A protein has these predicted regions:
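Short S/T/G/P-rich N-terminal loop/turn motif that feeds into the first structured element of a domain
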Residues: 1-50, 58-65, 91-93
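C-terminal structural segments of small proteins and small subunits
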Residues: 60-85
């Protein structure tokens, strides 16, 4: 989950929508990424985060490969400079 900076020209909603567009565009382009879906927060509150990514991988190795894939790294760089806070949870079904 990401919470974006509030002191930018872009609003957090604009950043979240652009991140959604970029991450979901990776579907079908990175081996091992079965599905990437971004949810954008629909209700503003002080404790709410702005966006969440749900991504499915067939293995931990596929997740590791995704993290360093050049197409993903471009999105990471876009988000990193706009991010106030980020948390993640990796779990196995």
């Amino acid at each position: 989950m990401w919470k974006f900076n509030r002191d930018m020209e872009e609003t957090p909603l604009q950043v979240a929508e652009e991140m959604k567009r970029r991450l979901e565009a990776l579907n079908g382009k990175i081996d091992g990424l079965l599905r990437a879906e971004v949810g954008v927060n629909a209700k503003e509150s002080a404790s709410a985060y702005d966006a969440v990514l749900t991504a499915d991988f067939p293995s931990w190795e596929a997740l590791d490969a995704y993290r360093v894939h050049p197409l993903h790294v471009v999105v990471v760089e876009y988000c990193k400079v706009r991010c106030a806070s980020r948390v993640d949870v990796d779990y196995e079904l």
